Amino acid sequence: MSVDKEELVQRAKLAEQAERYDDMAAAMKEVTETGVELSNEERNLLSVAYKNVVGARRSSWRVISSIEQKTEGSERKQQMAKEYRVKVEKELREICYDVLGLLDKHLIPKASNPESKVFYLKMKGDYYRYLAEVATGETRHSVVEDSQKAYQDAFEISKAKMQPTHPIRLGLALNFSVFYYEILNSPDKACQLAKQAFDDAIAELDTLNEDSYKDSTLIMQLLRDNLTLWTSDTQGDGDEPAEGGDN
């Protein structure tokens, strides 16, 4: 007997409260596969679930990669670290392709308004970006292209159809600028994009929606933090730029 949609959503909310994000993602994947367009709440649950599931692997990957580089003197330790990194990479890739499959098969084709379309295209850009973080050679070239195309498509729709203060438009600008900085190594383009988004939002602060005021101002702060980080000459090695979450 199939579980109904409301029950799956409730299960996802329970899992979120228990911080069991793998369960949360599994429930929201099932909801998505019913083929019905997601509500805003469901869309956010899906995004939060996978953001946490993939985030844990991204964080692990960074730690293991760092250890691998520091154990150059000991071949055995380095080999262990390498094998463990490869295991985490495999998990990370599987999660990303899971999400990208849901986006291409269900979410993007069913998106009936610009807000949803931008949200899902941004998500597509994000998950190809996560693949790019661990990819090398020809594979990296391919996922970088896919990420840039998804972000660019989302960016054009957001500029044409959404207020500069809309949290989804701001979150997209934040993550697209991180893509330029971290993946394409283009700090000038990253700063230009982030600054433009920040300035455009400041110029139209009166259009800030009361419901999304907190989200919008938080992302504006993150844009400004990244600009400060990227333009300072004393940038430390360990500084990670801020990314937008689940707007």
Curated annotation (Swiss-Prot):
Compartments, record wording: Cytoplasm
Disulfide partners: none
One GO CC term on file: cytoplasm
SMART domains: 14_3_3 (SM00101)
Keywords: Cytoplasm
InterPro entries, sorted: 14-3-3, 14-3-3_CS, 14-3-3_dom_sf, 14-3-3_domain
Known function: Adapter protein implicated in the regulation of a large spectrum of both general and specialized signaling pathways. Binds to a large number of partners, usually by recognition of a phosphoserine or phosphothreonine motif. Binding generally results in the modulation of the activity of the binding partner.
Name under which the protein is recorded: 14-3-3 protein zeta
Gene transcribed to yield this protein: 14-3-3zeta
